[in-house]
A protein has these predicted regions:
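Glycine/serine-rich anion-binding loops at beta->alpha junctions
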Residues: 66-87
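Active-site loop/lid in soluble adenylation, ligation, and acyl-transfer enzymes
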Residues: 1-60, 64, 72, 176, ...
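Fold-independent oxyanion-binding glycine-rich loops
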Residues: 8-10, 49-50, 83, 142, ...
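Catalytic beta-strand/loop module used to bind and position nucleotide/cofactor moieties
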Residues: 59, 79, 86-215, 236-250
Length: 250
């Protein structure tokens, strides 16, 4: 089965607008199933649709350091997207391709990341509902939304994320850390480079992610460009993701 592969980068607002644009156009059968691999440049923070902003992210720190932030249309928690240490993936595809059960659909899509991590010589495991763990620490998290015919799942793969900035950008309650059996965020999360003991490159990670998703999902990815309609719709949605009404709605 052939899927489109879109590789690119953009700021936090553009990336979220583009994911929604692709979702809406896939729902109308105007585009094919798509895997998008992208970088947040400059670095940014996204947080879940249902989250309360003042309980999720450190707004003062983000503003002082010119780190953009916005709310996602998907659930899940707050994420720091490092321009030099994290690749985000999004899968927008026919909902029939995935199990109806939410956990099993997460498991199927995350298998692409698990294959990727294995190709670096590390053991990874899926931890429901949406985490991937390496040596007991989180290296990836994902979030999902569904329309009638289409599923969107996007998530992270931290390969060299600055964990100090991550820790300062997000608000993680002591209760949540305790629930995971750790005291600090440094014990809770990790990166591929940290686990390997040497730095891996962005290009290597992207190339390996392509192979990992092809193997796990049994698909053939072909490189493609955004259509004019995708770009135009994303531009229209951009104002939504930049608006205070959307960002501060909860």
């Amino acid at each position: 089965m052939d899927w489109r592969l879109i590789i690119g980068e953009g700021n936090v607002y553009w990336n979220m607008a583009l994911d929604e644009a692709i979702l809406l156009l896939r729902e109308e059968d105007k585009i094919e199933n798509t895997l998008r691999l992208y970088v947040f440049n400059p670095s940014g923070v996204t947080f879940g649709y249902f989250q309360k902003i003042f309980e999720s992210i450190n707004i003062d720190f983000l503003k002082k350091n010119n780190i953009g932030f916005t709310r996602r249309i998907t659930g899940g928690g707050a994420v720091y997207h490092d321009a030099n240490g994290e690749i985000t993936y999004s899968i927008i595809a026919d909902i029939k391709f995935f199990p109806i059960d939410i956990v099993e659909s997460f498991r199927k899509i995350c298998s692409g990341l698990i294959e990727t991590i294995k190709m670096f010589g590390l053991n990874a495991e899926f931890k429901p509902i949406n985490d991937i763990i390496v040596n007991g620490r989180k290296v990836s998290g994902s979030a999902q939304t569904r329309k009638r015919k289409t599923l969107l799942q996007h998530g992270t793969l931290m390969y060299n994320t600055n964990l100090d900035i991550l820790a300062r950008s997000l608000i993680v309650s002591k209760e949540k850390l305790i629930a995971h059996g750790v005291k600090t965020i440094y014990e809770r999360v990790t990166t591929i480079s940290r686990e390997l003991g040497y730095k891996v490159s962005k290009e290597n990670v992207i190339e390996t992610m392509v192979k990992g998703f092809e193997k796990a999902l049994k698909i053939n990815l072909y490189r493609d460009n955004l259509s004019k309609e995708e770009e135009e719709l994303a531009k229209k949605l951009l104002s939504k993701y930049m608006s205070k009404e959307w960002i501060y709605r909860r």
